[in-house]
Amino acid sequence: QRLSASYDLMYRLGKDYVKPEFGIPFVDINGSEVAIREVIEVNKPFCDLLHFKTFCDNAATLETLKALPAVLIVAPLSGHYATLLRDTVKTMLQGHKVYITDWKNARLVPLSDGEFHLDDYVNYIQEFIRHVQATHGHCHVMSVCQPTVPVLAAVSLMASRGEHLPLSMTMMGGPIDATKSPTAVNNLAMNKSFSWFENNVIYRVPTNFPGAGRRVYPGFLQHTGFVAMNPDRHLKSHYDYFKDLIKGDNSSAESHRQFYDEYNAVLDMDADYYLETIATVFQDFKLVKGTWDVVSESGDIERVRPQDISHCGLLTVEGELDDISGSGQTKAALKLCSGIPASNKSHYEVKGAGHYGIFSGRRWRDMVYPQVQAFILAHHSSAKARKPKRRVSASTR
């Protein structure tokens, strides 16, 4: 038993982890089993807009589903796949129509598809918001960690142009103002020069991948950084897994496997996007200083002005024990969005929660989700959502 456990542990420590599946075949809504089918509605070179379409034979439940708010969840592009938010998606599906940004592994994107910049990220988000609005007549946006910054930029630019805005924004555990309560992640970016990152962590994709020759920040480096933040915790977890295998505790061992199958699956990021994020967010603090310019899809240079946002609810969420995005970093969005009335802004600190606890696990489901759901519903029911352009029939879209 001990020998078998040793082989199993060594295999898992050395294996190559592939992109996980969301694996949400159905959810229970009001006692009815609602089937889920993943559909790619917008296919971009570096990201798919994934829609979790719902299907149900129960007429009453179907009517309920049709009336639910449509939410675009913007997943982080910071090393892990969007499936890291599996629990977020599964919970949100109980009361919302759910879309998510499914970011692609840059090593699989051919050079012929061009580069990917932080500006492109912002433009992608705007395109996805418009798509959801065109489909449902409205959109709510929820961003988790890294994307809080480009999402705020995207909505700010839409506001400055006078576009139809999302009805609400929920921003969770993100570095809106990385100068507040700096964490180890912030300090690394602030204490190293831009050229250090360019010269030490950027590599070209090997020839055996579709993206051969592309400059990337490799996922394995990001994963090493994740583990280095809490080495004792990961070491103990692997040792506990080894003991569970010896004892024959298959349930605990399987929980370990599921977590690390997700945690160890990482993607490469395009070098331009990664380096520009380091400079813009963690070194120059352009968002909070009001000096961030974005090149639009049409080639125009536009200044990011969060103060131009007015007709949009804003909820910020922080974990009390978050060691990635420090206290006050996400809450800073409330001050930046000075054009939003105080009555439409709210902040929630999750007691006892670390970074991952605000979007996954018991605290997310029992503490955070009720706050998010109530905020979205409050701004959904009070707004006059435009009617969908396409008729909704057997599917809830």
Tell where the protein language model's regions lie, with residue ranges.
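Conserved acidic catalytic loop of the alpha/beta-hydrolase fold
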Residues: 108-112, 122-139, 151-156
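Alpha/beta-hydrolase-fold enzymes
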Residues: 1-9, 136-137, 154-272
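N-terminal targeting or regulatory segments adjacent to alpha/beta-hydrolase or S9 domains
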Residues: 1-31, 63, 395-397
